[in-house]
Amino acid sequence: MEVQPGGGSDRPELDPEAQGILFVVKGTATLRVNKQIHKLAPGGYAYLPPSSGWTLHNTDKEVLCFHWVRKAYDRVEGIDRPDILITNENDIAPTAMPDTDGKWATTRFVEPDDLRHDMHVNIVTFEAGGVIPFLETHVMEHGLYVLEGKAVYNLNNDWVEVEAGDFMWLRAFCPQACYAGGPGRFRYLLYK
């Protein structure tokens, strides 16, 4: 999403069953939810459960750019709905993957064992030379938006060059691997 200075919406979400995740990549969002105002700078993250009644405006002089991931919430009897969560990636320590010397890490805004959440948006980071050293698959479809850097990504046995601004949508069980050759780090926003 791109919002010009002075733009925004007093009612961006019209579906009362939709949950949303906002992730700011440029500018500053003024988010109002539950009568509280939050300023989301780059790296800012907001989880908004269904019927949150939020507003979002760009009160800054710079263009606001953010990702808005929406999904109908799947209720499960006996499990409470998630709470609103406002944070910034800089406030969360990345978790290094085992046996990677810290060259492959994931920043998790919500822990995967929190069953209240039926979708997740994380940041995956590879330092130069970092790899997914094996073909992996996932049971669910998922999307990747490249935030920074360049890499080659194995998608269903085809090696594809990807860079900042690229988007990939992977079907369930699509074999994948990655090599981030550098010179800088490679990062992507992961939705699943």
Please report, for each region that a protein language model flagged, where it lies by residue.
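Long compositionally biased, domain-poor regions of proteins
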Residues: 30-32, 55-58, 127-129, 150-155, ...
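Ligand-binding loop in jelly-roll beta-barrel domains
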Residues: 50-76, 164, 172-192
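Conserved short histidine dyad/triad with adjacent acidic residue
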Residues: 1-16, 107-110, 122-138, 172
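A short, N-terminal "cap"/entry segment at the start of jelly-roll beta-barrel domains
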Residues: 5, 11, 61-119
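Glycine- and acidic-residue-biased ligand/ion/polar-headgroup-sensing regions
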Residues: 17-30, 34, 139-156
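Short, solvent-exposed loop/turn positions at domain surfaces
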Residues: 10-11, 18, 34, 42, ...
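Short acidic-glycine-tyrosine-enriched beta hairpin
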Residues: 35-50, 156-172
